[in-house]
Amino acid sequence: MDRCCRPDDRGAPGRARGAVDGVRGAPDDTGEALDLPPSRLTITFGLGRSLFQTAEGVDRFGLADRLPERLIELPHFPGDQLDDARSGGDLCVQACADDPQVAVHAVRNLARIGFGAASVRWSQLGFGRTSSTSTSQQTPRNLFGFKDGTANLKAEEQEMLDRHVWVDRADDDRAAWLAGGSYLVARRISMHIETWDRTSLQEQEAVIGRTKGAGAPLSGGDEHATPDFAATGTDGEPLIPTSSHVHLAHPDQNEGAALLRRGYNFTDGSDGLGRLDAGLFFLAYVRDPARQYVPMQTRLARDDAMSEYLQHTGSGLFAVPPGVPARGGYVGEALFR
């Protein structure tokens, strides 16, 4: 971890160090980000449960006594069709940048640095945000064409972040090293794009529970209006269907549980029948996965009308240590000391 997770200044604009130094040996940098600006690159590291203890109970690295209580094995949810080759992992890296080539460069070099000690189990390249994380951002759209993440936690909501995202030292005696960090839920969700595209607009909006254009709840108002789940139409039926995604996923319907989503859309080409392999790479930071994510996803998997158009194919849960100073220290240092 010290070798790959210590802050460096190679992302500074104009720095060519490593990519062109030396002639006889392999370069210390792969070089595809030469001449590119840092592009607001961020790198987030997570630790999987298997790093601490395997499913068979083997303590490979002497870390079992520091396994966080909340770093659980996510249950199998109804309808899951998980690919083991796209699930789990000892470590996780989320690299984000305004330029995808800069993000790929970061991951590529981490894999190069880790050669011989770690190898890539699976990866996913995403594009475009699927949730706004700041009040200054507009709500983006997912590949179904709807605004996604309207009720997402925002960076300016410090009290909410403290309550729902950041781990407190008192949360777990065995995981004091994780204080100031979080837990990352990762789910690769394939979308049946072609089926969705043949669905009427009225049905699409009923499935989501919001208007497609403005993103307003079907109970009325603008995008950020509080959904009125008790409101009914002239036929006596709820304006927001009880099987809609909004009804089942909104914090008001989940005992106030909120998530900080930071996911992305993805397309991985098409299959032999010309169908897009596309969807949502769902990424959410939470303080307590068993309380905030599992109950909500159980309800969605069981009752969400949108499940007809989705297939969960990959899954993971990771403990995300707090960040490090600009100089000195490395990610996860408190765990390994």
PLM ranges: what are they?
Residues 2-337:
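Long, histidine/aromatic-enriched segments associated with O2/redox biology
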